[in-house]
Amino acid sequence: MAEILVKNARIDGAVTDVLLSGRTVSRIAPAIPAPPDAAVIDARGGVVIPGFVDCHSHIDKSHLMDGGRAKYVHGTGAVKGGLTRVEKAAFTVEDIYKRAEAVVKTAIASGTLFLRTNCDVDGYVGLKGIEALTALREKYKDDITIQIAAFAQEGVFQDDKTQGLLNDAMRMGADLVGGHTITFGEGERHIDFILDLAAKDGVEADFHLDESGNRENY
């Protein structure tokens, strides 16, 4: 098992050493002798903290303005949503993978160990995002834990495809199912579908609770 000794690390204000055995912190103490073949890093008094947790992201729709793509403008949510749908219809699995991978690499380099991302599942993008993100999750599984929420961004009952697609997304490896509390007037019907699907598959449900801007809706 590979070992790493971090010397002169600052934890809770005190300078100490940290010994890592594989992915586990095996010892924290001053002046730990370096085990044979251990890699030694001098933290030089830098702060050592647990890895970061990113509990809400949408990496399937990241970097949409890169490379001369969509030129988003200030406007209403409806306008921005319409622009996003135009983009989503043109997504490919490879395109989503490349853009999402850039986010994952940045997250790892910044000390993030856990990332939960929504992934749109609807009649515009289909299951392309799920295919891309499950492959990405597998590639980086030793560096970061990625949870994928099959997300009903465009509602559940706005077409005749989304309900089946959400079920298919769970079969393809989505970790949980996501929805809105207020989406296209679907109301409790939307919430009930998401909760029922989560219960059927024994997974968590992840809801956006703040989409309308009207406190009476809560």
Each model region followed by its residue ranges:
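Di-metal (Zn2+ and/or Mg2+/Mn2+) metal-binding site signature of metallo-dependent hydrolases
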Residues: 46-68, 211-212
